[in-house]
């Protein structure tokens, strides 16, 4: 199973582009499955409750919960939902989100350690969007989550740079895609076209 993880700060379009990439892969005849974190499993439901809370969230606790939810997904959830092991698993956020988000409060080294059982992705697509653009998109939503504050997202964005360096050092193919170019937001089709082309190439598949 080849894991393709899509990452970025909240408001960068990770969920949208994960769904579109999966559709392109499936349309090309690839046995692809779309997976989202937090999952719909028992631990994932607990995490979602914390994320919607207006109270503070303990970073260490969240790191452990996300790690447990991730292993549940990899060992049980994916097989059940995907009807076996897919050729390509497109993940709407993976352990790199934990390293960035919980790494801010708990330290990258410790969060990395509790996620060692989760294999590295083959490809990590990082959608790079300025914090102010992400916040504008988040503000347009009906509901916001506990992590979606300007100060915190800025720290997460900086932490992602460390996470990307770590992933590269471990042999992960990192694909950085700009969501804004020349000060102008790129359209969804434009961004997805670049993501699909570069992912297909990295996987050794015919052009999307």
UniProtKB/Swiss-Prot annotation:
Chain segments annotated as coiled-coil in the UniProt record: none
SUPFAM superfamilies: P-loop containing nucleoside triphosphate hydrolases
This protein's record includes keyword Kinase: yes
Gene3D superfamilies reported in the protein's UniProt record: P-loop containing nucleotide triphosphate hydrolases (3.40.50.300)
PANTHER family for this protein: THYMIDYLATE KINASE, UMP-CMP KINASE 2, MITOCHONDRIAL
One Gene Ontology biological process: dTTP biosynthetic process
Enzyme class: transferase
Transmembrane segments annotated in the record for this chain: none
Name assigned to this protein: Putative thymidylate kinase
Reactions catalysed according to its record: dTMP + ATP = dTDP + ADP
PROSITE patterns xref list: THYMIDYLATE_KINASE (PS01331)
Organism the protein comes from: Aeropyrum pernix (strain ATCC 700893 / DSM 11879 / JCM 9820 / NBRC 100138 / K1)
Recorded GO MF terms: ATP binding; dTMP kinase activity
Pfam families given in the database record: Thymidylate_kin
Gene Ontology cellular component terms for the protein in this record: cytoplasm
Protein family membership: Belongs to the thymidylate kinase family.
Alphabetical UniProt keywords: ATP-binding, Kinase, Nucleotide biosynthesis, Nucleotide-binding, Transferase
Gene of this entry: tmk
EC number(s) per entry: 2.7.4.9
Positions of region (Defective ATP-binding): 8-15
């Amino acid at each position: 199973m080849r894991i393709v993880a899509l990452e970025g700060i909240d408001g960068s379009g990770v969920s949208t582009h994960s769904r579109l990439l999966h559709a392109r892969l499936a349309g090309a005849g690839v046995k692809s499955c779309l997976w989202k974190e937090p999952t719909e499993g028992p631990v994932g439901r607990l995490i979602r409750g914390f994320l919607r809370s207006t109270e503070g969230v303990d970073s260490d606790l969240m790191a452990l919960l996300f790690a447990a939810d991730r292993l549940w997904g990899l060992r049980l959830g994916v097989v059940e939902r995907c009807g076996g092991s897919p050729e390509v698993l497109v993940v709407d956020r993976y352990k790199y989100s934990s390293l960035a988000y919980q790494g801010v409060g708990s330290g990258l080294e410790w969060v990395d350690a509790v996620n060692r059982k989760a294999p590295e992705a083959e490809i990590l697509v990082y959608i790079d969007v300025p914090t102010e653009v992400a916040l504008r998109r988040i503000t347009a939503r009906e509901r916001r989550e506990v992590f979606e504050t300007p100060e915190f997202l800025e720290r997460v964005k900086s932490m992602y740079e460390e996470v990307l360096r770590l992933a590269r050092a471990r042999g992960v193919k990192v694909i950085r895609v700009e969501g804004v170019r020349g000060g102008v937001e790129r359209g969804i089709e434009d961004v997805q076209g670049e993501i699909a082309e570069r992912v297909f190439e990295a996987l050794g598949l015919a052009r999307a």
